[in-house]
Amino acid sequence: MGCCGCGSCGGCGGRCGGGCGGGCSGGCGGGCGGGCGGGCGSCTTCRCYRVGCCSSCCPCCRGCCGGCCSTPVICCCRRTCGSCGCGYGKGCCQQKCCCQKQCCC
């Protein structure tokens, strides 16, 4: 039920306005194997479940600890986000980007 038929990869919480060309390369069986080629369109929510995985509409994530920013930009939580007080396991980025050393929630 994802934005580009990649529900297993998280998809998009909202709508994918720009249309996702190739979607997630690799089929998204158990997560995006090689990541997505590039970000697509405009997404309202993007989620990255593990390092190297990205949703069908979110730019590739690296070093994520549970979530991407809720804006279509390349910025993900770092593993040190647990000390930011933004929540652990569910991603520390709720509305803004997570910096390399601290969250900007």
Swiss-Prot record:
One CC-aspect GO term: intermediate filament
Swiss-Prot/TrEMBL keywords: Keratin, Repeat
Region span, 14 X 2 AA repeats of CG: 4-87
Family: Belongs to the KRTAP type 28 family.
Protein purpose: In the hair cortex, hair keratin intermediate filaments are embedded in an interfilamentous matrix, consisting of hair keratin-associated proteins (KRTAP), which are essential for the formation of a rigid and resistant hair shaft through their extensive disulfide bond cross-linking with abundant cysteine residues of hair keratins. The matrix proteins include the high-sulfur and high-glycine-tyrosine keratins.
Note: Human have a similar number of genes as other primates despite the relative hairlessness of humans.
Protein name: Small cysteine and glycine repeat-containing protein 4
Organism: Homo sapiens (Human)
Upper taxonomic lineage: Eukaryota, Metazoa, Chordata, Craniata, Vertebrata
The encoding gene: SCYGR4
